């Protein structure tokens, strides 16, 4: 039923070749990161074949981080992806570096315009030159510049004060502070860039007491992935693409949320290309579900849009049966409430 709704799909009739397995399990969580906590609890006692499938390899990184810390074996089949080399990861690590060393003019020039403070390139270059000449921070040099507007000086001082607070936070809080309080999310939204990587970074930072440890942890995780590609562990972490043609006894679909899978919800698809991408996302979600041989578990995140999972929930047999029962009950009630029909008058009585 799910894949049959794809408008660009050739009509096919799919018939099962085996009996019914266990019903689809829906795990309801409040937030995206709660999926990782649930899966980590599963991983602790995983002794039989269990696959966690996802669209983007970065979705698995918080779970991999926890498994590494706890010494839980796993097999990773997702490739390196683009997460570690992405501009967003580079920006966050640069901002953390600047928070620890406000004299790093090279880093400052890479990020000064991403905080929402209207610093011109000429002003930024002057601040760097003055910082190197006088040995002061770039913020001190900028705020002391002749002709700087009072409002800009106040904004720069506030930004410098905010960055100075970062080293006293854990890395997860620091990522969220940069994102929400220091303007980085607004910058990404203005550029129409994906903000999903920010949540992954924040989750990875939760177990790091200070932000300065985050860049090193990212490098460590990047190297770790290469060491688990051929592991024989029962816990398998794989992209859906890598799982095509394979089946697993038990499957969990991770991050089936709007913005990830699908990349864009159906209501937001306007152009033919966007619609085709949405249909491709439907097929990918279907592929993920059908990798389950015996058990399938989906997450429904209350704090996120989950249009594909909602559609599955709507069409679960028990929900369809309940709707049909309600419709029948409403029909019976309407029939009972209707006034009795008037008897027909014989034609012979009509004058």
Locations of regions flagged by a protein language model:
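Accessory helical subdomains and C-terminal extensions of nucleic-acid helicases
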Residues: 45-49, 103-236, 295, 314-335, ...
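Conserved RecA-like helicase motor-core motifs
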Residues: 71-82
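Short, conserved phosphate/pyrophosphate- and ester-handling motifs at nucleotide-, phospho-/glycolipid
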Residues: 3-7, 120, 245
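Conserved helicase core region in the C-terminal RecA-like lobe
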Residues: 56, 115, 213-263, 280, ...
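Conserved helicase motor core of SF1/SF2 NTP-dependent helicases
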Residues: 1-5, 13-16, 147, 257-263, ...
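Conserved short internal alpha-helix adjacent to the catalytic or cofactor-binding core
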Residues: 80-116
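C-terminal accessory regions
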Residues: 257-334, 344-349
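Helicase P-loop NTPase motor core
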Residues: 1-73, 97-101, 165-169, 347
């Amino acid at each position: 039923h799910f894949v049959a709704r794809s408008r660009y799909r050739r009509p096919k009739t799919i018939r099962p070749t085996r009996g019914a397995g266990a019903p689809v399990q829906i795990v309801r969580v409040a937030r995206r990161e709660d999926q990782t906590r649930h899966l980590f609890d599963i991983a602790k006692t995983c002794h039989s074949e269990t696959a966690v499938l996802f669209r983007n390899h970065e979705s698995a990184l918080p779970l991999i981080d926890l498994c590494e810390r706890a010494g839980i074996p796993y097999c990773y089949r997702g490739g390196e992806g683009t997460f570690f080399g992405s501009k967003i990861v580079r920006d966050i690590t640069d901002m953390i570096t600047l928070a620890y060393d406000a004299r790093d003019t090279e880093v400052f020039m890479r990020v000064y315009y991403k905080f929402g403070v209207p610093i011109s390139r000429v002003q930024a270059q002057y601040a760097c030159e003055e910082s190197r000449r006088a040995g002061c921070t770039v913020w001190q040099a900028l705020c002391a510049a002749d002709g700087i507007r009072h409002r800009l000086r106040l904004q720069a001082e506030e930004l410098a004060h905010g960055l100075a607070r970062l080293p006293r936070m854990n890395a997860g809080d620091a990522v969220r502070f940069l994102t929400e309080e220091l303007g980085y999310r607004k910058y990404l939204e203005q550029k129409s860039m994906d903000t999903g990587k920010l949540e992954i970074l924040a989750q990875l930072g939760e177990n790091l007491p200070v932000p300065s440890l985050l860049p090193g942890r990212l490098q460590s995780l990047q190297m770790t992935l290469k060491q688990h590609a051929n592991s024989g562990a029962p816990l398998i972490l794989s992209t859906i693409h890598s799982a095509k043609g394979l089946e697993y006894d038990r499957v969990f679909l991770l991050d089936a949320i709007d913005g990830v899978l699908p990349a864009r919800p159906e209501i937001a698809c306007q152009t033919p290309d966007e619609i085709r991408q949405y249909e491709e996302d439907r097929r990918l979600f279907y592929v993920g579900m059908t990798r389950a041989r015996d058990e399938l578990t989906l997450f429904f995140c209350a704090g996120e849009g989950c249009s594909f999972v909602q559609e599955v929930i709507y069409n679960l047999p028990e929900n369809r049966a309940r709707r049909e029962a309600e419709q029948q009950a409403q029909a019976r009630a309407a029939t009972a409430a209707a006034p009795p029909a008037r008897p027909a008058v014989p034609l012979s009585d009509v004058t």
